[in-house]
């Protein structure tokens, strides 16, 4: 790597020198070489020790904290497109999954760049490059306005809230415009080994054998029939959060939105309408109970399962004003605690009973790691959640009841964080208490610094699968301006989820830029043009993982295929006669018998097996045809067969209508 010699040596502090390019644009800048150089401060009980080539930064208790140095008033504006390059060694005893470089400007705005070290070998000198450039920090405080021309200090920070020790030795820290960007996440490469394993898993767990047996009206096998196997809907749930106000009426302005929902998804979550403040009218006229009910009815009418989100979000800021007024009196006395419990019970009774039988799932409690004000003000603490689950079940006997939280998968590859452990322990405690907990919700909100590789996703899911509960991705999105990276990770994350046996559904947290809390994460732009991540979704869900084939029945009347599990329409045609049959392919496969209103041996198609058919056969003899003619000679569709072997016209008509109306695969997009 080339280092342009500086015309003048500029010393940021007395401890280390910074070299600056004589050109307009610097290509490399040394920030610290850590050779017998002290840190200027530590925080969070961190310690450091210096050496001739390294500075060890550590905390034997936990990973929250860091150490920093002053930079005076350093101008880094010429290095806006540079990346961090850090040389370090992970020491024995380290339990942290990452560290971050933090820069602060003269106004104390801060930007951070996080380095995922989960795959780093202990004791091995390692060089890592930041995934983003200096002008694109992945976190911080008002980082979008970080003033690179007035940088006052840098810090090396540990992993927030990780209870394990932090222990790294740092050799060099510099900025470079010439270094190649790193792989954005483990497994990004086109030839990454996990891809073959995912394909094998998907074939094993998401597909099944489908054997279609075609017979004539007498039950004899029919060869040469055309068998169209047309998938209509996945068994696996692919869905999105949706806006009730766009579904609840016939406003033409929402026609495209509704059309997309109907075509693209078989499961949906009302994003905001069932949240407690919205439900009781505190969020304005755009949220009504009647509108929420109408939206759920519309989704059900279009064969889309509905998730309820959420019943209790137990943080102060997410509660209605009536609950806030109670909590404002904290610490609560016994009567106030009783009032708090009564308010929660009334909330559960109201909303759970209103939607009983309409929802496939409920997020009963949302984000308990960060939201626990209600539990903190009750003597039973987190045990109160078990009572809430019991009360929801009493009001709704069918919905699967979920706990839901974020930053379980979006960890930058970390597989054993404090939050993951808390979530696992909370789920296990609820289950062991006998609470009717049925599912685990993984939200999945990602940015460029929190991308977790597919194999790490599997490792995390394997751990939670051991609890024996349903598992869903409940709120996936990836917000970034890099649309190609967004598409690549959407493809790979969705593939990893579909390839994991414990996963049942994949729900995004919005799909259209004009109806998304994080517009950059949407699949469709405001003008409904599709983005690369949307194309990745379509390619997987409606092409690579979609079964739509045309077969021909063999001499035994068999048309066999291995298809993706879900709903199908099977269309069998021979000699101008057609039968359409709905079918569902699921675990264990399916043996489907379809009788055509024809007679084997009726080679001229006139509904009778007679001498004329023998003459036709003589001109074009086929294997088994003579036996068919002999077996059915003298029979007639109209006079000699019971009508029970011929599909009723009404059934055929209904199946055809279903074919036209229910297909989820459409060229509209």
Segments predicted by a language model, with ranges:
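Short, threonine-centered small-residue motifs that mark membrane-proximal processing/anchoring sites
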Residues: 6-18, 23-28, 596-609, 623, ...
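Substrate-binding cleft and catalytic face of glycoside hydrolase catalytic domains
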Residues: 267-282, 290-409
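Extracellular glycan-recognition surfaces and repeat-rich motifs
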Residues: 30-61
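Short beta-strand-plus-loop segments that form exposed binding edges in beta-rich domains
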Residues: 155-163
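Aromatic-rich peripheral "rim/lid" segments of glycoside hydrolase catalytic domains that contact
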Residues: 185-189, 340, 354, 363-382, ...
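Extracellular ligand-binding interfaces
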Residues: 55-142, 150, 163-169, 174-176
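A cross-kingdom C-terminal cell-surface attachment/processing module
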Residues: 650-666
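Beta-strand-rich domain onsets/edges
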Residues: 178-247, 276-283, 307, 326-332, ...
């Amino acid at each position: 790597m080339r280092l342009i010699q500086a015309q003048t040596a500029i010393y940021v502090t007395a401890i280390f020198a910074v070299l600056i390019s004589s050109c307009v644009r610097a290509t490399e800048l040394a920030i610290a070489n850590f050779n017998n150089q002290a840190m200027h401060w530590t925080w969070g009980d961190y310690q450091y020790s210096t050496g001739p080539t390294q500075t060890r930064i550590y905390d034997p208790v936990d990973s929250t904290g860091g150490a920093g140095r002053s930079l005076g008033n350093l101008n880094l504006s010429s290095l806006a497109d540079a990346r961090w390059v850090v040389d370090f060694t992970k020491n024995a005893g380290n339990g942290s999954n990452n560290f971050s470089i933090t820069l602060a400007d003269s106004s104390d705005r801060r930007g951070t760049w996080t380095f995922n070290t989960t795959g780093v070998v202990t004791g091995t000198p390692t060089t890592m490059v930041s995934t983003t450039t200096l002008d694109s920090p992945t976190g911080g405080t008002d980082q979008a306005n970080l003033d690179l021309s007035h940088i006052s200090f840098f810090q090396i920070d540990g992993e927030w809230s990780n209870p394990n020790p932090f222990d790294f030795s740092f050799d060099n820290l510099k900025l470079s415009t010439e270094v190649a960007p790193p792989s954005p996440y483990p497994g990004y490469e086109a030839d990454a080994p996990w891809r073959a394993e995912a394909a094998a898993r998907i074939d094993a767990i998401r597909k099944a054998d489908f054997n279609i047996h075609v017979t004539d009206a007498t039950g004899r096998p029919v060869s040469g029939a055309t068998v169209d196997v047309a998938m209509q809907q996945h068994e696996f749930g692919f869905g999105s959060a949706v806006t009730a106000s766009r579904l609840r009426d016939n406003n033409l302005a929402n026609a495209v939105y509704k059309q997309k929902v109907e075509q693209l998804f078989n499961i949906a979550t009302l994003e905001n309408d069932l949240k407690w403040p919205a439900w009781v009218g505190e969020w304005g006229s755009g949220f009504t109970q009647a509108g929420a009910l109408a939206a759920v009815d519309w989704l059900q009418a279009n064969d889309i399962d509905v998730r309820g989100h959420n019943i209790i979000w137990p943080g102060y800021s997410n509660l209605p004003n009536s609950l806030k007024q109670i909590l404002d009196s904290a610490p609560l006395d016994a009567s106030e605690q009783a009032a708090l419990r009564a308010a929660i019970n009334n909330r559960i009774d109201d909303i759970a009973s209103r939607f009983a039988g309409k929802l496939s799932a409920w997020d009963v409690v949302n984000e308990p790691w960060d939201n626990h004000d209600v539990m903190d003000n009750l003597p039973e603490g987190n045990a109160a959640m078990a009572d809430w689950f019991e009360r929801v079940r009493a009001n709704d006997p069918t919905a699967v009841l979920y706990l839901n939280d974020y930053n379980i998968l979006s960890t930058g590859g970390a597989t054993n964080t404090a939050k993951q452990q808390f979530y696992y322990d909370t789920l296990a405690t609820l289950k062991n208490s006998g609470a009717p907990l049925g599912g685990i919700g993984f939200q999945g909100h990602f940015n460029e610094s929190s991308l977790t590789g597919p194999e790490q996703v599997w490792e995390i899911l394997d751990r939670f699968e051991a609890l024996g509960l349903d598992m869903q991705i409940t709120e996936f999105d990836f917000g970034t301006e890099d649309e190609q990276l967004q598409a690549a990770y959407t493809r790979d994350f969705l593939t990893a989820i579909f390839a994991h046996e414990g996963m049942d559904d994949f729900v995004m947290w919005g799909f259209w830029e004009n109806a998304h809390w994080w517009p950059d994460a949407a699949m469709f732009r405001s003008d409904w043009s599709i983005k690369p991540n949307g194309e990745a979704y379509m390619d997987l869900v409606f092409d690579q993982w979609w079964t739509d084939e045309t077969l021909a029945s063999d001499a035994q009347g068999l048309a066999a295929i291995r298809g993706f599990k879900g709903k199908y329409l099977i269309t069998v045609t021979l000699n101008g006669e057609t039968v359409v049959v709905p079918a569902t392919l699921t675990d264990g496969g399916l043996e489907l018998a379809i009788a055509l209103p024809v007679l084997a041996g009726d080679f001229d198609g006139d509904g009778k097996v007679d001498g004329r058919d023998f003459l036709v056969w003589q001109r074009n003899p086929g294997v088994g045809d003579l036996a068919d003619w002999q077996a059915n000679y003298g029979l007639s569709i109209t006079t000699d067969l019971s009508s029970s072997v011929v599909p009723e016209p009404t059934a055929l008509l209904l199946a055809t209508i279903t074919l036209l109306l229910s297909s989820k695969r459409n060229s509209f997009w």
